[in-house]
Amino acid sequence: MDSRRSLLVLALIFISFLVYQQWQLDKNPPVQTEQTTSITATSDVPASSPSNSQAIADSQTRGRIITLENDVFRLKIDTLGGDVISSELLKYDAELDSKTPFELLKDTKEHIYIAQSGLIGKNGIDTRSGRAQYQIEGDNFKLAEGQESLSVPLLFEKDGVTYQKIFVLKRGSYDLGVDYKIDNQSGQAIEVEPYGQLKHSIVESSGNVAMPTYTGGAYSSSETNYKKYSFADMQDNNLSIDTKAGWVAVLQHYFVSAWIPNQDVNNQLYTITDSKNNVASIGYRGPVVTIPAGSQETITSSLWTGPKLQNQMATVANNLDLTVDYGWAWFIAKPLFWLLTFIQGIVSNWGLAIICVTIVVKAILYPLTKAQYTSMAKMRILQPKMQEMRERFGDDRQRMSQEMMKLYKEEKVNPLGGCLPILLQMPIFIALYWTFLEAVELRHAPFFGWIQDLSAQDPYYILPILMGISMFLLQKMSPTPVTDPTQQKVMNFMPLIFMVFFLWFPSGLVLYWLVSNLITIAQQQLIYRGLEKKGLHSRKK
């Protein structure tokens, strides 16, 4: 297969990939739930049982707002229920060079995205008639220098029972401990069920065909390591899964919020949809906890609200790092990301790291590239003999095919040898594509000059234009036996078509393709020199 036909194959694979991406974005079939849910569509918390449906009243006024802060995030807590209504990520700007922290969780008139938790059940303190109004002295709580963790207890007392909702902040971590300590001095046993949920305005996933981004739910259970559950899925079928281990999450491009309940007990994962208010919730409900009179009980859970940091999330909960979704190319994307990170740690620039990774990839593929050009050179030499066979055997395709295979064997030529490097390069390209869409480390990562965000498109389209020029040069420098005028015109337009597609791709990905083309041109000239010495190639066309 000659270079230009290889380019056509590459274009077809590339366009098919983009079409598939858009189809996945537009048509995500609903997941069938494992059992019928007992959660009502208007509920704000899960029902404790089918016959005892409890809910939070949406009309309640807000309590006092307190602020919790460590070195990576700043949280706002509503003392009415103890919900997390805001999370500002101090190490991530909202926009490039804005100096304003990115706010992940937030509650405004236009948009709601909050993390709720509470106690329901027979003696629950979060009911349709009201929620616990916690008390605490002070409004601002900050992890001090040299302090590794900070516990902030909210207090609520009712009928001889003392409830403490304790928030635990840790240095350098987006993992927030949310524990309940219950002291029952009421004279009789009480029963409660813990729950945690993420409440989010129903929105469509953003992005475009080149850079689609997912906003929606996800969960992990004992049977399913990781599964997206979109807002459309929630509207079609409320989720209800019983599992011993697992978590629920809402994904938003480079960021994620996730409730992780006690992994040693059975929990129900669920969703609730409120079409009237255009809101959906995904959460968990724990088992009934009985606290005898005169006894104490502690119920643990944690909330991750922050960037998709794979290494940290892997230590918080099993499979939470899978929210960094590399798609089917994960087995390539993970080592590539590791290599990118390793090199970036040395060169301190993600753009230079991309260039270095490109050099490594092209060096690894060089033997195949050399075999590709050698195979194409031999195929060109065989063209007269192949044409003679076509004329000799005419319509006898079976005989012609047999004779051609015999010729390939005698001349030691692999007719598919030119395809292999192309087929290997596409998965690498797709893996890098998903890396740029998913790895928060590349968000707002500068290169130099006008490229200040390698995860975004080139604002002046300089890299895509250079990439198109490099493809044009590579095509012109590659000899081809293509004689059909129509096919020739299609091939001539390929660099332009690719350039247009790449206008909206992450600039880091375009940089990879540009450098790859330049290296291929250099490798091509080196290989051609060797082929000329063997009489397999002539620079004269």
UniProtKB/Swiss-Prot annotation:
GO terms for molecular function: membrane insertase activity. Keywords: Cell inner membrane, Cell membrane, Chaperone, Membrane, Protein transport, Transmembrane, Transmembrane helix, Transport. The keyword Protein transport applies. Residues 34-56 are annotated as: Disordered. It comes from the Bacteria. The chain crosses the membrane at residues 6-26, 337-357, 416-436, 454-474, 495-515. This is Membrane protein insertase YidC. InterPro entries: Membr_insert_YidC, Membr_insert_YidC_N, YidC/ALB3/OXA1/COX18, YidC/Oxa/ALB_C, YidC_ALB_C, YidC_periplasmic_sf. It is found in: Cell inner membrane. Belongs to the OXA1/ALB3/YidC family. Type 1 subfamily. Required for the insertion and/or proper folding and/or complex formation of integral membrane proteins into the membrane. Involved in integration of membrane proteins that insert both dependently and independently of the Sec translocase complex, as well as at least some lipoproteins. Aids folding of multispanning membrane proteins. It is a multi-pass membrane protein. Its main location: membrane. GO terms for cellular component: plasma membrane. Interacts with the Sec translocase complex via SecD. Specifically interacts with transmembrane segments of nascent integral membrane proteins during membrane integration. One of its GO terms (biological process) is protein insertion into membrane.
